[in-house]
């Protein structure tokens, strides 16, 4: 079941929370709405579900306009962050609930409901807990029950509002893998809200990054990481180093050092340079690729690589976070050399260098 979101606007009083949002979601795709608090992601999810109504614009499911349909008529499954299980019902009865309250003409027989719920219990690996009550379950088990309940009515669209937000880190990782496997098996169209970058990129086919009621970028997870469309996406998607400097002529100046850009930008003046830890060239020896001296102030071994915090020596004031491959862990106080690869230059929100990779090499 495809979803078409066409020019959706939403305001609460004088506060505009969604600004002309348009997005097409193909049938069978799993999409993450990713953004900080206040970005509009949960409001958009609730509008898709029919739990909120847009101020203007349209929602279409497989070409049919559902903008004015009540939530129960849209036939979507919805999973809340805090499970919303019925405390007085067993696991079995919670999952069966959506089937038992269907109109009589649509309601399966008791035998069919039992068969369906038993299948779902096996699918979510909770058959042995069918007779327990929610208070007797762990957080991860409760979320599986909530998901099974949403799937019981066989929705063609599944919506999830921060489904793993209330769980501890290890359980979140396990459920993310499980949800992805379930999606591969059942091929339902799914949209979920999260503020967790790792969760979005691990689970989703496509990540929609939102900020202040706007879509900043809608793309495959690896492209959101490697080719951020805006400065907001670049900074929001994870740890990034920022250096302030100045463009003069065809050179980038920081402190007493300058590097050739390989071109002369139309803009001249103060800029911010961004690059992720793994985009920094790092070596124990100085070279054309790694000419800048730094000193290790923190070293955190991560197995096949080490995450370092290094202090530039004489050429910049703030520490940088970098990644060094291999098992030979640098020691605190050790002197290394870095080069700034794949750097991006911005003046405010405006990117000022070509979109191909920029390498800041040997000091001029």
Curated annotation (Swiss-Prot):
The keyword ATP-binding applies. SUPFAM superfamilies: MOP-like, P-loop containing nucleoside triphosphate hydrolases. The complex is composed of two ATP-binding proteins (CysA), two transmembrane proteins (CysT and CysW) and a solute-binding protein (CysP). GO terms for molecular function: ABC-type sulfate transporter activity; ABC-type thiosulfate transporter activity; ATP binding; ATP hydrolysis activity. Residues 3-237 form the ABC transporter domain. It holds the Pfam family ABC_tran. It comes from Salmonella typhi. The gene is cysA. Transmembrane segments: none annotated. ATP binds at residues 35-42. It is found in: Cell inner membrane. It comes from the Bacteria. One of its GO terms (cellular component) is ATP-binding cassette (ABC) transporter complex. This is Sulfate/thiosulfate import ATP-binding protein CysA. Its EC number is 7.3.2.3. Part of the ABC transporter complex CysAWTP involved in sulfate/thiosulfate import. Responsible for energy coupling to the transport system. Keywords: ATP-binding, Cell inner membrane, Cell membrane, Membrane, Nucleotide-binding, Sulfate transport, Translocase, Transport. It is a peripheral membrane protein. Its main location: membrane.
């Amino acid at each position: 079941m495809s979803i078409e979101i066409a020019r959706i606007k939403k305001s609460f009083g004088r506060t505009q929370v969604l600004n002309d949002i348009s997005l097409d979601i193909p049938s069978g795709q799993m999409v993450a709405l990713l953004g900080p608090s206040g970005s509009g992601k949960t409001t958009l999810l609730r509008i898709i579900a029919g739990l909120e109504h847009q101020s203007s614009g349209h929602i279409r499911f497989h070409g049919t306009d559902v903008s004015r349909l009540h939530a129960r008529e849209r036939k979507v499954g919805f999973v809340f962050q805090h499970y919303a299980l019925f405390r007085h019902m067993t696991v079995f009865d919670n999952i069966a609930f959506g089937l038992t309250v269907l109109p009589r003409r649509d309601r399966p027989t008791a035998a069919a409901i039992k068969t369906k719920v038993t299948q779902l219990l096996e699918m979510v690996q909770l058959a042995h807990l069918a007779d327990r009550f929610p208070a007797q379950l762990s957080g991860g088990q409760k979320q599986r029950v909530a998901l099974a309940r949403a799937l019981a009515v066989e929705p063609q669209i599944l919506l999830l509002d921060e489904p793993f937000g209330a769980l501890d880190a290890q359980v979140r990782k396990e459920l993310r893998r499980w949800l992805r496997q379930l999606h591969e098996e059942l091929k339902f169209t799914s949209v979920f809200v999260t503020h967790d970058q790792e969760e979005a990129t691990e689970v989703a086919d496509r990540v929609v990054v939102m900020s202040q009621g706007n879509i900043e970028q809608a793309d495959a997870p690896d492209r959101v990481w490697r080719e951020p469309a805006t400065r907001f996406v670049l900074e929001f998607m994870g740890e990034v180093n920022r250096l302030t400097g100045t463009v003069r002529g065809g050179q980038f100046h920081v402190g007493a050092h300058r590097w050739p850009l390989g071109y002369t930008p139309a803009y001249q003046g103060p800029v911010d340079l961004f690059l992720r830890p793994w985009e920094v060239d790092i070596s124990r020896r100085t070279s054309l690729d790694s000419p800048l001296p730094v000193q290790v102030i923190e070293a955190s071994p991560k197995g096949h690589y080490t995450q370092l915090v290094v202090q530039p020596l004489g050429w910049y004031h703030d520490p940088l976070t970098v990644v060094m491959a291999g098992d030979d862990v640098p020691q605190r106080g050790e002197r290394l050399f870095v080069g700034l690869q794949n750097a991006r230059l911005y003046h405010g929100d405006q990117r000022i260098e070509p979109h191909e990779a920029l390498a800041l090499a040997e000091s001029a």
